[in-house]
Amino acid sequence: MDFCWKREMEGKLAHDHRGMTSPRRICVVTGPVIVGAGPSGLATAACLKERGITSVLLERSNCIASLWQLKTYDRLHLHLPKQFCELPIIPFPGDFPTYPTKQQFIEYLEDYARRFDIKPEFNQTVESAAFDENLGMWRVTSVGEEGTTEYVCRWLVAATGENAEPVVPRFEGMDKFAAAGVVKHTCHYKTGGDFAGKRVLVVGCGNSGMEVCLDLCNFGAQPSLVVRDAVHVLPREMLGTSTFGLSMFLLKWLPIRLVDRFLLVVSRFILGDTTLLGLNRPRLGPLELKNISGKTPVLDVGTLAKIKTGDIKVCSGIRRLKRHEVEFDNGKTERFDAIILATGYKSNVPSWLKENKMFSKKDGFPIQEFPEGWRGECGLYAVGFTKRGISGASMDAKRIAEDIHKCWKQDEQVKKI
């Protein structure tokens, strides 16, 4: 990929009717274009840099890891031990705790970007990306403060990930409640201090919902938790080590169902019978359910103790909302001052990527499941869609960099001939 190739491509684009009719700046990129500067995008850019390949990283926000920096609550820690959340090549600092804080994780990512000299193009919203059959290249249209830019590249990496857009459910009467009280997604929630003395309903019983309830409790709020579906709650640590680390170790030697049975027996010994608290367990074990559906078990950091003491109340699903009131599926009605939606996030790939083979239009995930979903056709790649957190993204980043490097070397050999 040299200067001559770039000039040749610019020559072709000079006679392209799209460039003539559209007031946009055209940028020919010799390396890959990566969409998204979260941990997945940074990991991919770093792995490419290690192999001598420079990429262009497009990020719609004004900072790296915008989900972590702008849309997470203050008390957040990594839910898994740091060794399972490291990006490729550079580990966490040795003096970081087992479960780094939100700010420590951000510092790690910023240092990671500095050490690899990764400088994303910020405030760039990718509106579309499509493969041009005539050019044999991807055309990525991005809108920023200085107008529209079209990036033309051979390789395109979708790194916007699983958590690009908040999932906001609609309940009957939501507008009426919002007119009198507060309704916000966890992406706008920072601290329970904003709700001291308030009656708050938290919708969603995943790790975020559970931890937000605990945070509200610690600041003197009166939280209730909507639990509509069955959920696995495990202690964050068991037998003197992390539950996740112990699970990964046992899976090397035992079948998944036997490991699940072990986890549930130990969890019951430590936490008690969660069904007595209104938290029914799914039929499948926690690890098997994670593999099949991607649904992550909750790692308890103190919320169950508050449920047992009655400081956090467990409620059934919501039927409808009224002004200051919530009617539940069991027919009960209660008053609340605020509702926090801990209802997760979704992929936004279908909104900008114009292709029909690699990504599902339904959920925005690769159609091929892990570990096969990282590579598509025509130089298209995906990172951060494994449903296996940062460790899964790191695995894909390494594969992508190696694959692009292989193509890069082949091109160089052809030119020498």
From Swiss-Prot:
Entry EC number(s): 1.14.13.168
Subcellular location: Cytoplasm
Main subcellular location of this protein, as a coarse class: cytoplasm
Full protein name: Indole-3-pyruvate monooxygenase YUCCA6
Binding residues annotated for FAD, in chain numbering: G36, A37, G38, P39, S40, G41
Disruption-associated phenotype: No visible phenotype, due to the redundancy with the other members of the YUCCA family.
UniProt entry keywords in alphabetical sequence: Auxin biosynthesis, Cytoplasm, FAD, Flavoprotein, Monooxygenase, NADP, Oxidoreductase
Naturally occurring in which organism (per UniProt): Arabidopsis thaliana (Mouse-ear cress)
Chain's role: Involved in auxin biosynthesis via the indole-3-pyruvic acid (IPA) pathway. Also able to convert in vitro phenyl pyruvate (PPA) to phenyl acetic acid (PAA). Required for the formation of floral organs and vascular tissues. Belongs to the set of redundant YUCCA genes probably responsible for auxin biosynthesis in shoots.
GO biological process: auxin biosynthetic process
Catalytic reaction(s) noted: indole-3-pyruvate + NADPH + O2 + H(+) = (indol-3-yl)acetate + CO2 + NADP(+) + H2O
Pfam family, one: FMO-like
PANTHER family per the UniProt record, alphabetical: FLAVIN-BINDING MONOOXYGENASE-LIKE PROTEIN (AFU_ORTHOLOGUE AFUA_4G09220), INDOLE-3-PYRUVATE MONOOXYGENASE YUCCA6
Family per record: Belongs to the FMO family.
Any GO CC annotation of this UniProt entry: cytoplasm
